[in-house]
Each structure stands twice: as structure tokens, then as C-alpha cells.
Amino acid sequence: MAIKTKTIQLPSMTPGTHRTVSVLSFGKSGARPKVYMQAAIHANEMPGTMALHHLMPMLTEADKKGLIQGEIILVPTVNPIGQSQLVGNSHAGRYNHLSNENFNRNWIDVSEPVAQKVWKKIGTNPEANVKMIRKAALEALNEMKPANELQTLRVEMQKLSTDADYVLDLHCDIYAALHLFTAHNDWVKGPTGPLGNEGAVKALAADLGVEATM
């Protein structure tokens, strides 16, 4: 199957301009399980975007071979508002310059409207309950009237993610700890050499300056 793309246009806050969010879908629309992945809601945290960039061709190939059982939605660059915020040569993508809000705060709370829709209908079938609650959450989001660009972004992303079985919101930091990944057998089987396997792994980690061994 071909990759499916969707473009969400945000309301313009400046005459003559507008921003968009690109959404990529793999697998069968509406199929389960549904996985939603977004990156760079803090817009200067770009490793998540890079991770999804490298994931895309693998998903495209898997989709062509019919290997994706459910639906996978990627939003590699979820925050075009923050992407545009440059101060001199510095990228300031964590807070919205207009409202001073952290981009990853103040998501839309639909718990009350959902509760009002479903509390008399909850039954003993867990799967039916989940389906009903997801439907009510989407209805509540569709009833929202966002007042500005940032609110629109939040509502639209929650529409994509609120009924997902798995949600991955990719972040990073300005510092990355160096990890050493080793196979289980390399760690527990031995001895190999004077240190044994565990000792050899620890010695290698020390030589490399590794901070975490997995």
C-alpha cells in the first residue's frame, strides 16, 4: 500500500501566512492496534524527528509487503509554531512566544464532557466501554472551538491520538548519556578470559566512558 499523507492547516496568526502539519499513515485506516507517534512538540528537540525520519522507509517497505497489522500514524514535526521561533541564531522551541505556554502543557481535558456522555451507559463489557469512551472523546474534541493557532494544534493532534492503543511522544535533552548495549548471553555466560564475561563488559564500558550498560 502507498503511504497516505494528510496536511492539517492551522489558522493564520499573521496576514499572508499559514502553517501546516504533515500527517503520515501506514497500514489500514481504522484497523487495530492503532499506534500514534509524534516528535518535536518541543520544537528544538530534533532527534525524535530524525528517529521518525529513519523509521519512515522501514514502515513504507513493511506496508508494501502487507506486514502492518493495524494502523500507524506518524507526525514527524508536530509543532510548526515552535519551529519558526528563532531568536538570533538560537532555536527557542519549548515555549510559545505569544502566550509563554510550554508547548507540552495545557492539552485539552475532555474528561468531564466524556463522563457526561458515557456515565449512564458504562456496562460490563470492557471492550465495548473502551470503544464508547473513545468515541465520546472524539466527539468532545470535534465540538471544541479553538480560539487560536496553538489551541487548534492541540485539538487536531488529540483527534489523531485520543483513540490510539499506543501513543509515543518523542522527546530528548541537550545531553545524551552514552549507552553500551550487550546481548544477555554476553553478560551472564562465562567465564571468558580472566575477567569473565561480566567483568569484560564492565571493563569495556569503563574504557569507553559508558554511563549505562544494558
Label every PLM stretch briefly.
Residues M1-M214:
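Structured catalytic-domain cores with a bias toward divalent-metal coordination
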